[in-house]
Amino acid sequence: MIDQRVTLKALAVAVLCSYATYSVAQGLGDTPGPETPSEIAPLEADPQILLNRLGTLTGEGDAVEATRLANEIQERWTHTGSATLDLLLQRGIDAMQDGDFVRAIAHLTALTDHAPEFAEGWNQRATAFFLTDRYGEALSDIEQVLILEPRHFGALAGLGIILEELGDEQGALRAFRAAQQIFPAEENVNRSVERLEAATGGRTL
């Protein structure tokens, strides 16, 4: 049970934090130069267009492009349009990575209070709540994320992680399958689907 718990915590950090951390750092750092691997045309800057494309990348050879595209999507998700609010998000993520969850939750709560329409603020606070075993609050925040952005693959994966931690394997499988449909090249999610299909016989209520 302890090993499984540690594995789920590590998976939560990998799935819920990685893309947002990359994206916010990109936004607050230097502007990428001309050697950026793949540019996205302005017409395709809408995350919904990018999400449509992400769902078509299903082959083993698509993993690098899918990860790049997921990062592009999260880069758009992690910008509020306000430098002050973007900084609150970055401070919350930094505090979470430092293990200071009280400070992380404080920053992210300030963010959700000031920008309740900003899905990523709720998503990152859900991560902090999960990592401090506050599952009810984490689930509530994930629900808010999915109201604002139903195709938030990180939040869906996070929902799967929490439900599995709570022993709801069928609910977890449904959540991971939903994330897989949006981001089929995500290895952590694919492994979770395989594991839970084996555990449940592939059945969900």
Give, region by region, the residue ranges found by the protein language model.
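N-terminal leader/linker segments that initiate helical-solenoid repeat arrays
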Residues: 2, 17-86
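Register position in tetratricopeptide repeats
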Residues: 97, 131, 165-166, 198-202
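Terminal, low-structured helical/coil segments at or just beyond the last alpha-helical repeat
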Residues: 28-37, 41, 68, 75, ...
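Alpha-helical adaptor scaffolds
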Residues: 82-154
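Bacterial N-terminal signal peptides that target proteins for export
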Residues: 2-11
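A conserved position within tetratricopeptide repeats
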Residues: 54-61, 74, 112, 146, ...
